[in-house]
Amino acid sequence: MVPRTPWHDEALVVFGEVARDAARHFIQWWNIHKVFSFSNRLFILPKTYDDKEELTVHNWKEFLEDHPCQINGQCVRSIGPWSASTKTTETSILNAYIQMIDGAEHFIFIENEFFVTVANDSFIQNPVSETLYQRIVRAHRLGEKFRIYIVLPLLPGSDNVNIVQASLYFIMRSIAKGDNSLFKRLEIAGIQPNDYISFFGLRQYDILMGRLVTETIFVHSKLMIVDDQMAICGSANINDRSLLGERDSELCVVINDIEEEQCLFNGRSVRVGKFFSSWRRRLFSMILGTMRHNENDIDVSDPVSDQFYNYFREVAHKNTLIYEEIFGVLPTNCVRRFDQMYNYTDKPKLKDTDPNQAHEKLKNTQGLVVDYPVYFLDEESYLPSLRTREGISY
């Protein structure tokens, strides 16, 4: 057996017309691949529905703990001639991301396995970074209180060194490495990036066979929640493979909440979706460690205020410093060049020099959140050689 890193994912259960559309997408995909692969498996025929009553699900209590919420949903896809034999390439997932980011009024929360989106780049074509940049610039110009939280895996999920290098290289180029990165473009525009946008990872610790150990939590979600009013969730990563429609086939659901409730954002009363607000609060509570024990009475309902945004960042940074001192974790902002790597990793680690003190310090960590190391190896170029498959593919 090969041990697997801890895993974090988010998903949806949907009923009604949007579920029917998801089924029809699968049928279309299944049938065209049967043709291409000359498989003996049977074709699937979609069921015909005469009215909406047939779509009603009465046995939801068998697989849901709580009563389902009412929402408006729409399936969106990345799909094209090669993957589904369509006449045109469909990029409705990308269109949804762009429209939702541009229309966000208060905050954006993203969990994704990738963040590969570079403006003005000859390789990376999707405009997610440009849209985030323009939304932040607009917030800065108008004096708006606007926040973006992005949670990513601390390392790409692969045991292939070339894949890890290539993925990490382009993620860092997207965030802070080079003049076309999101952070650098904001700084050139006179904007402090962390006033509006922050990147985070997830990490945990435990005692294994009498020794303190730590492990990153691999974020596999493909989720964006906007203003606690709408969301997109599905299979699409934030990269060209998932968003341009000409490569991987993807399916997501865009959801608007119907049931609303009152909430305060930065001291202002706003209407938020009942479903999305509860979903986002649950995620923040898990990330900050307040789901079961909330000794400091932290209110996660307002993601916009300076108080909460700074608290979120402070918890992440405090946790990061503790993990670096005790375990010498990688990746880290302490290592910006290869020649700094060994100096950092060779330093005595508190888990070895004083395990009892290390364990006491680890009790001061809160939740799972840590800083995303946006400046890790930012003075180095580690893109795999173009002679490798991974170097060519990017």
Q: Predicted segments — roles?
A:
Residues M1-Y394:
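Charged, low-complexity intrinsically disordered terminal segments
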